[in-house]
Design a protein with these regions (language model features):
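C-terminal cap of metal-dependent C-N hydrolases
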Residues: 346-348, 352, 365-407
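Divalent metal-dependent hydrolysis catalytic cores, especially in the metallo-beta-lactamase
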Residues: 103-129, 141-152, 174-187, 212, ...
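His/Asp/Glu-enriched, well-ordered alpha-helical/loop segment
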Residues: 100, 208, 280, 291-377
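Acidic/histidine-rich helix-loop elements
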Residues: 82-101, 153-162, 185-193, 275-288
Length: 416
C-alpha cells in the first residue's frame, strides 16, 4: 500500500486515545500464561518503560489489578492483509488503495486488531509507511512486520535465477522484513505456478541476506517450497503426511488456517460477490463450504506430526480484522489442538518464527511489555479469547475495561 506516513498519521488522529505508561508500573495477576506453556500464579509483573523488568509477587504499589482475569502475552497474527477492507459502498475494496479514504480504512483495521489483543502482526501487504508510523509511536496499532513487494511471477520476477536473486536483494534494500512468495494459485488449483529454479534461487538468496521467506503454497507447491528450503509454508492445502514430516525434519514453520477465512467469505458473500477474483453472485459462494473440512483437516493432520512448528496466522481480509481470534477458536474446536498449544502458537512460537523471540511472545524479563487480560480462562473455554479486557503494548495501555468486569477487584488506574 503506497501512502505516506503523513497520510496515515492524519487518518489515525481521531483514534489516538491511549495512555503512555509511567516509568514503573506494577500489574497484579492471579493467573498468567507465560506464552511458552507454563502458568504463573499469584504474582506481579513489573514494567519499566516498554519492558518487563521483574516478576515479583511482592512488588508494590499495585497500579493495575488484573486478579480474577487471565493474563497473557499479546497475541501475534503471522499472516494478515491489513489493507483489505470494505469500501464506502459496502463491497470488497481489495487491497493496497492509495487514497486518503483507504488509509483511514487500513488504520481502522489495525486499531481494531490491537483492541482485540493482537500486539504484533505480519502483513502480506506492503505497509512500510504504517509500520514506521507505529514504530515511532505515532499510531495506536499492533507492531507491524511488512513486505515491500511480493514475488508473484510477473515482470522482472519471471527471469533467470540470477534475476530473481537481484529482485530479492532489491526487497532487502527497500526495507522488507521478510519476502512473500506466491508459489501456487487459489485453493482449488493444484499446480505450482513459479519455476522450481526461481523458487530455490529466491529462498537461497533470502537466506544469505538474513531475510525470511514465507511461501503461499498449496498442493504441488508445498513440496516445492520444502525442497527450496523456505522459512515458512503458508496455507498448505493438499500437504501430504510426507510433506508435513519433511517440514518438521527441516525446521520449516507451518501456517495453516482452520476455517475462519472460508467462513468469512460465506458470511460476507454479498459484499465480496462481483468484485475482482470472486464469484459474480452470492449464490456461487456456496461451494466454498466444501473447503471448510479440508482446511480443518490440514490442521488436524499437522497437529499429529511430532516436532512440526505450527504458527498462528489467519490470512485476515475484510470482515476479519478485530475478529482474528475466531481462527484460534476454530483450531481448538474443529482442529483438535489443545488450548495451551494453540495459544503458544500465537505467542512464543509465532515470535520465534519471526526471529523476534528475544523481544516479544512471552511474559519474561527483558521482553516488551505486551500484556493482555481475558475475562475467562481460555484453557477451560477457548472462547474466552473473545473477551479481551485489557491491552498493553510496549508498556502503553491501549484498552482498559477491567472496571466493567463484575468479578474484578479494585483498580487504581484507568485509561478511559
Amino acid at each position: 500500500m503506497r501512502v505516506t506516513t503523513f497520510l496515515l498519521l492524519l487518518a489515525m488522529a481521531p483514534l489516538r486515545q491511549f495512555a503512555e505508561a509511567e516509568n514503573r508500573v506494577v500489574i497484579a495477576v492471579s493467573t498468567a500464561l507465560d506464552g511458552k506453556g507454563k502458568v504463573l500464579r499469584d504474582t506481579r509483573i513489573v514494567v519499566s518503560g516498554s519492558k518487563i523488568v521483574a516478576i515479583d509477587p511482592k512488588a508494590s504499589p499495585i497500579d493495575y489489578d488484573l486478579r480474577g482475569l487471565t493474563v497473557m502475552p499479546g497475541l501475534i497474527d503471522a499472516h494478515v492483509h491489513i489493507t483489505s477492507s470494505f469500501g464506502p459502498d459496502g463491497k470488497n475494496a481489495g487491497m493496497g488503495g492509495a487514497t486518503l479514504e483507504a488509509a483511514y480504512r487500513t488504520a481502522a483495521n489495525a486499531y481494531a486488531t490491537l483492541l482485540a489483543g493482537f500486539t504484533t502482526i505480519q502483513s502480506m501487504d506492503s505497509v512500510a509507511a504504517l509500520r514506521e508510523a507505529v514504530a515511532h509511536g505515532g499510531l495506536p496499532a499492533p507492531r507491524i512486520l511488512s513486505i515491500t513487494e511480493p514475488l508473484v511471477g510477473r515482470g522482472e520476477q519471471t527471469g533467470t535465477p540470477d534475476e530473481v536473486r537481484a529482485f530479492v536483494r532489491k526487497q532487502k534494500d527497500a526495507g522488507a522484513d521478510f519476502l512473500k512468495i506466491y508459489a501456487s494459485g487459489g485453493m482449488r488449483q493444484t499446480a505450482q505456478t513459479i519455476p522450481q529454479t526461481a523458487l530455490e534461487a529466491a529462498c537461497d538468496e533470502a537466506r544469505k541476506l538474513g531475510l525470511r521467506t514465507l511461501v503461499h503454497a498449496n498442493y504441488d507447491a508445498v513440496h516445492g517450497a520444502i525442497a527450496a528450503g523456505c522459512t515458512q509454508v503458508e496455507h498448505g492445502l493438499g500437504a501430504t503426511e510426507a510433506d508435513l514430516r519433511a517440514m518438521a525434519e527441516k525446521g520449516i514453520y507451518f501456517d495453516p488456517q482452520a476455517g475462519q477465512l472460508i467462513q468469512n467469505y460465506l458470511d460476507n458473500r454479498a459484499r465480496y460477490a462481483g468484485t475482482p477474483y470472486f464469484p459474480k453472485t452470492p449464490q456461487e459462494f456456496e461451494p466454498m463450504r466444501e473447503l471448510l473440512p479440508i482446511t480443518q483437516g490440514v490442521v488436524q493432520r499437522a497437529h499429529k506430526i511430532p516436532g512440526l512448528k505450527i504458527v498462528f496466522g489467519t490470512d485476515a481480509l475484510a470482515g476479519m480484522h478485530g475478529h482474528n481470534v475466531e481462527d484460534l477458536i476454530n483450531r481448538v474446536v474443529e482442529g483438535g489442538i489443545a488450548p495451551m498449544d494453540a495459544l503458544v502458537s500465537a505467542n512464543s512460537l509465532a515470535a520465534e518464527a519471526m526471529k523476534m523471540d528475544d523481544q516479544i511472545g512471552a511474559l519474561a524479563l527483558g521482553l516488551e511489555a505486551d500484556i493482555i487480560a481475558l475475562d475467562g480462562d481460555p484453557l477451560k473455554d477457548i472462547t474466552a479469547v473473545r473477551g479481551v479486557a485489557f491491552v498493553m503494548k510496549g508498556g502503553t495501555v491501549y484498552k482498559n475495561e477491567i472496571h466493567s468486569m463484575p468479578h474484578s477487584r479494585s483498580h487504581s488506574k484507568s485509561v478511559r
